């Protein structure tokens, strides 16, 4: 069925395939996601099919198991990637996958009343530490906002995401070059042949 969907996407002129290998963040239980992550073999097969059809693959993924499965499968971008550990970041650094943290999807929820700030802060702090570690390790990373998510407006989201990186890492040329490199990799990978 997935192969047929990918062929339909190609016929309709799609530019890439986005898969969802894990659920959403569970804001009531820090460190957990909703639902059950897809099996590693299933993720690998999905990525293989999409790549064979000439598509780059974005993967909505959170949690250690899910992120490791996506990286091992060869996804082109890892969207979100919350709750990773240092081992997973090392795998990411050694791979061809670009991480797109989408920090504002959680940061913009602070003070909005939808979730308790006390539940959001540990997620935010862990994500900030992952960004620092990723920078130090040379993980290929790019900006992305997940625009359209709750409190993430189109247009504003990417500016807020860049500001988040500046707050975490500073605004040095090294940080700018790091993010630019990740973006350039994405631009090359996501050109349909």
Predicted features by range, described:
Residues 52, 115, 125-193:
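His/Asp/Glu-enriched, well-ordered alpha-helical/loop segment
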